[in-house]
């Protein structure tokens, strides 16, 4: 019996361990800065002042448009959602059946058991009522800034950018990550772009440490709130 209990506890611990979300880790290779590939040195030509890959028009600005260039994204995200639903379903039914004649003869006759007449009649009635009310609301806000690098330049000139910022505090670490697509026309002269102009944005704000752990429910609470709980 003790062996069966130990095996059961180990199985429950394994299932609950799979419900735990792994904390974010620093130095994710996907969000690492992307550096431009250094071209192989060409043969020296005396008097040459042109270097392939680093040309710039006389009237161009210094906005980012190459792999490895730096862009500052201004975070100004606000989302608000609400939903409310009401339902009320009612149904009443009533059925009444009475037989007064059969093959042309009356169905009413003297009752040999007691007084009164016999009558083959039936009556049925029923009602059902179902009501439901649900309401949900959510609001989020994120402001700040993060500097990222250009990871890829698409054939149509769209810049694929990504990057992360880790801040180490006394009680843990705070993480901000972002990845998405930016038009070169949306970049300001100081190489900044608002987050609302980032297409296909993937923004993550998370952390590790005492504050992050305190805001998470315990493993037993997660079990009761998970789909594994049968009730």
UniProtKB/Swiss-Prot annotation:
Membrane spanning residue stretches: none
Gene name, Swiss-Prot/TrEMBL: flgH
One GO cellular component term: bacterial-type flagellum basal body, distal rod, L ring
Complex and partners: The basal body constitutes a major portion of the flagellar organelle and consists of four rings (L,P,S, and M) mounted on a central rod.
HAMAP family, alphabetized: FlgH
Keywords from the UniProt entry: Bacterial flagellum, Cell outer membrane, Lipoprotein, Membrane, Palmitate, Signal
Single Gene Ontology BP annotation: bacterial-type flagellum-dependent cell motility
Position of the signal peptide: 1-18
Main location, first listed in the record: membrane
Bilayer topology term: Lipid-anchor
Top-level lineage group: Bacteria
Family, per entry: Belongs to the FlgH family.
NCBIfam families according to UniProt: PRK00249.1-4
Region (Disordered) location: 118-141
Location in or out of the cell: Cell outer membrane; Bacterial flagellum basal body
Listed name of the protein: Flagellar L-ring protein
MF terms (GO), sorted A to Z: cytoskeletal motor activity
PANTHER family (alphabetical): FLAGELLAR L-RING PROTEIN
Species: Pseudomonas paraeruginosa (strain DSM 24068 / PA7)
Lipid attachment points (S-diacylglycerol cysteine): 19
Lipidation (N-palmitoyl cysteine): 19
């Amino acid at each position: 019996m003790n062996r069966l209990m130990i095996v059961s506890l180990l199985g429950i611990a394994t299932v609950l361990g799979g419900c735990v979300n792994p904390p974010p880790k620093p130095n994710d290779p996907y969000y690492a800065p992307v550096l431009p590939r250094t071209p192989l040195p060409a043969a020296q030509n005396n008097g040459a002042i042109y270097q392939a890959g680093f040309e710039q028009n006389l009237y161009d600005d210094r906005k980012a448009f190459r792999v490895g260039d730096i862009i500052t994204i201004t975070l100004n995200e606000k989302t608000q959602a609400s939903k409310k639903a009401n339902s009320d379903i009612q149904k009443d039914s009533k059925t009444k059946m009475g037989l007064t004649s059969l093959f042309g003869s009356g169905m009413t006759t003297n009752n040999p058991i007691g007084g009164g007449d016999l009558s083959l009649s039936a009556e049925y009635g029923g009602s059902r009522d179902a009501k439901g009310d649900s309401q949900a609301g959510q609001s989020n806000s994120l402001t700040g800034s993060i500097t990222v690098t250009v990871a890829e330049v698409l054939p149509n000139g769209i810049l694929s950018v990504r990057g992360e910022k880790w801040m180490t505090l006394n009680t843990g670490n705070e993480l901000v990550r972002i990845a998405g697509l930016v038009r070169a026309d949306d970049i300001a002269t100081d190489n900044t772009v608002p987050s609302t102009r980032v297409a296909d944005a993937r923004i993550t704000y998370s952390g590790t440490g005492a504050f992050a752990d305190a805001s998470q429910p315990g493993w037993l609470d997660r079990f009761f709130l998970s789909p594994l709980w049968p009730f």
